[in-house]
Amino acid sequence: MRPLPWSPDTVPLMLAPMQGVTNRAVRQVLAQWGWPDVLFTEFMRVRPGADNSAARLSQGDLADARPHEHGVPLVAQLIGRDREVLVAAAREVQGAGAVHLNLNMGCPYGRMNVGCGGGMLERPEELPDILGSLREAITGSFSVKVRAGYADPEQVFSLLPVFEAAGVDFLVLHARTVVQRYEGHADHAITARVVQQTRIPVIANGDICTVEGGRRVLEQTRAAGLMLGRGALRDPLLFERLRGRASAAPAEGELRGTHQRFLRELAQRYGALFCGDAQVLSKLKSSLAVMDVPEDSKPYRALRKAKSVEAFCEAVEALAA
């Protein structure tokens, strides 16, 4: 097993990769004062090159191929369907600086589901070859982010021997099926059974939004760690709360101050990362949309209704007034 992207004898708390949301700016802000143990890139879409064997990755993706973000280990996530192209992409991303690589086998959305992401679970017979070839090509840690199954939540148990034989270093399990998308609830009873049945470290993912919920999942599953998504954007201090280094629940009014700081710093970074007022505003509102802020609150309504970055920033300053 290669060195994992977290310190031994710790229970790692990871920021989930969320396409269109956890971009470089979000990761940098959270790395500086949210303190996740591990960060993931948004998925890097792998397409065939001109000769159908080389990978074609965007320059933006390659710019994110680095070993860490502000000192926090960074895992580069790939999404694709063809073995040769995925292997070429893994080599290219490592050549650009990535150390830890992850294969997305869980994305449930249609355009990514044609054989990619969660769509790979419709072709389980191809997985030994794909995973084995990736393992040979990856010199650092190699992990898989996977759903419990495509339509059958028991499918993951038939995949565990495949993951073990391929030498996968750790699994991130979102305990829903692909067809569920984000409906219903993540079934962490499945996570607990997976932990019991594999020697691979398992990171629990899905519906972990509070300290109480996170601790319950750890106790129920005995997972090696947790991956936080929307919960960490709603409350960037959730990582520290889970460690017991911040209050278990935000005090009254505390979240507004946290959101103010988060959105203020994000707006500053987005100005350098994206082009033009319209794109920056769109990205800010995308972040706001996953923060699960109160819909009936006047300060948050002002953020949603802002027509310019300037108006958005003015509304940010009014949040904790």
Model-derived features with residue positions:
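Hydrophobic faces of well-ordered beta-strands that scaffold small-molecule active sites
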Residues: 13-16, 39-41, 74-78, 101-103, ...
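Glycine-rich phosphate-binding active-site loops on the catalytic face of alpha/beta enzymes
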Residues: 42-46, 101-110, 175-177, 207, ...
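Alpha/beta enzyme core
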Residues: 32, 87-101, 105-115, 125-200, ...
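Alpha/beta catalytic cores of nucleotide-metabolism and tRNA/nucleoside-modifying enzymes
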Residues: 1-14, 19, 25, 129-132, ...
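Short glycine-enriched, charge-decorated loop/helix-capping segments at active-site entrances
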Residues: 54-56, 116-121
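Flexible, glycine- and charge-enriched loops at secondary-structure boundaries
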Residues: 120-124, 184, 252, 256
